[in-house]
Amino acid sequence: KSFGIIDSLKKEIQKCKLEPRNHKKHEKTDYKLSSKIITSIKNILSHYKIKSSDITCIGFPGITLEHKPSKKRSSYLGDPNMIASKTSLIVISDFRQCDIDAGGEGAPLSAFFHNYINKKRKDFITFINLGGFANITLKSGQKVLGFDTGPANYLIDMWCRRKFNKGFDSGGKLASKGNIHTKLLKNLLNDRYFKIKPPKSTGFEDFNWEWLQKHLSKFKSINRFDVLSTLTYFTIITIADAINEYRPESRQIYFCGGGAK
């Protein structure tokens, strides 16, 4: 069961992302988000008739405000202490910083979960986790590789909000009305991130509205449907490239996450 975030709170969260280190401005949004999460937890326990005593712990990664492992920095919205206090449950949080301090990327987190639930499998297996950004888990026996492949829904949803006044492209119906702009696609794929070898991670610090506008400015006006179609194919290509380069022998590929549908 899942609970959505109302549009007004989503807008506040987006504003916080523009100033990730202005903690004073984040206080109200942080409180609202934490309150929403607390209410959702209580609703889930009530809906499924689960006792608090049956819950071992809650994993809370928060909503990422800034993720810059090269600068030893990763921050998020949401107060785990408040959530623990109001639900009387153990809350585990701040997953990323320790790994970053040890020289890691702090992301993606899903690779640990994918490895754990499949630890007895010895065959080649691949997971693609689709959210705002896409990450991949490549598992072969005890060997596991996980990294971000690039944008998934983030650029697509952003374009839909600005150009179609829609939160997302339901069923890819809007993108299907356009054509792939091959020259724009080539420009997008030429980004330096795709030349970096894993382990690596990325986010809206690298791929955002300004980044997209920089590439669009190289061409005369492109039909909004064509841009959306190109962004969608861009996501597909970057995922396929990652599979082909690091695990071409994969025969089982599982898609998961909010964008899997």
Roles of regions detected by a PLM:
Residues 16-29, 166-172, 222:
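Short glycine/proline- and acidic residue-enriched helix-loop micro-motifs
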Residues 68, 184, 245, 259-261:
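Short glycine/threonine-rich loop-to-helix capping motif typified by GTGT followed
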Residues 69-74, 85-167:
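Phosphate-binding/catalytic loop of phosphoryl-transfer enzymes
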Residues 24-80:
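Short beta-strand-loop/turn "lid" adjacent to the catalytic site in phosphate-handling enzymes
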Residues 51-54, 121-123, 247-251:
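Short helix-loop-beta connector
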Residues 250-261:
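Glycine-rich phosphate-binding loops at beta-strand->alpha-helix junctions
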Residues 1-3, 142-236, 240, 250:
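Conserved ATP-utilizing enzyme core subdomain
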